[in-house]
A protein has these predicted regions:
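Early exported N-terminus immediately downstream of N-terminal targeting peptides
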Residues: 28-95
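C-terminal motif of bacterial Sec signal peptides marking the signal peptidase cleavage site
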Residues: 17-20
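Second-shell loop/turn segments in exported
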Residues: 75-83, 143-148, 162-164
Length: 185
């Protein structure tokens, strides 16, 4: 008799579970769905992976680094994929970035050399995500996500020269960029 009353409870819990799942496409689900797909390369790493010596940086740089939690990088290479898939996937990512939460910060480039667009989630002094979309009709596209908590845009921008000085070759990040290099004919 007890079992009879438990069945509606289990059924209700299962229904609530399915209803609570967000079936809307998002940049996160796109990343997860494509990280092992043909033509794609993906890398995730925490900010500690950069191995920055805190004694060699300013207080502002330290605050910026502490606000970053991790990086996600996803790339589609034309040398490993096709032009048709490239265009379709790039358009899909662009549609995802039209979501209200993404604020386009700026864009650079042209259709010949390639384009860069930078998006943020949150206010300039209180961001949770920075998204960099790079695309080239000769190479492919890449989406780089910087995820964190209360990131400050001006402090994050100051990290550019610091990151350029890092020796990232030994950390296998070069495999991502080599994958994204154009093929030579």
């Amino acid at each position: 008799m007890k079992l009879f009353f438990l069945k509606p409870l289990y059924f209700t819990l299962i229904c609530l579970l399915f209803l609570s799942c967000n079936s809307e496409p998002s940049l996160q689900t796109y990343y997860v769905d494509h990280q092992e797909a043909s033509g794609f390369i993906a890398m995730d790493f925490p900010v500690s992976f950069l191995d920055i010596d805190i004694n060699d940086i300013t207080e502002s740089e330290q605050k910026a680094i502490n606000s970053i939690q991790k990086f996600n990088m996803l790339g589609y290479s034309l040398k490993s994929g096709s032009d048709i898939v490239y265009k379709a996937e790039l358009n899909f990512v662009k549609q995802l970035l039209k979501e209200v939460k993404y604020n386009e910060l700026f864009r650079l480039g042209n259709s010949k050399d390639g384009r860069i667009k930078i998006y943020t989630v949150g206010e300039d002094h209180n961001m949770d995500e920075v998204v960099i979309l790079l695309n080239s009709n000769q190479v492919g596209f890449a989406v780089i996500r910087v995820l964190g908590k209360d990131m400050n845009l001006s402090e994050i921008m100051q990290l550019g020269p610091l990151i350029e000085k890092l020796d990232l070759d030994y950390k296998n990040i070069d495999s991502f960029f080599n994958f994204m290099k154009p093929s030579t004919l």
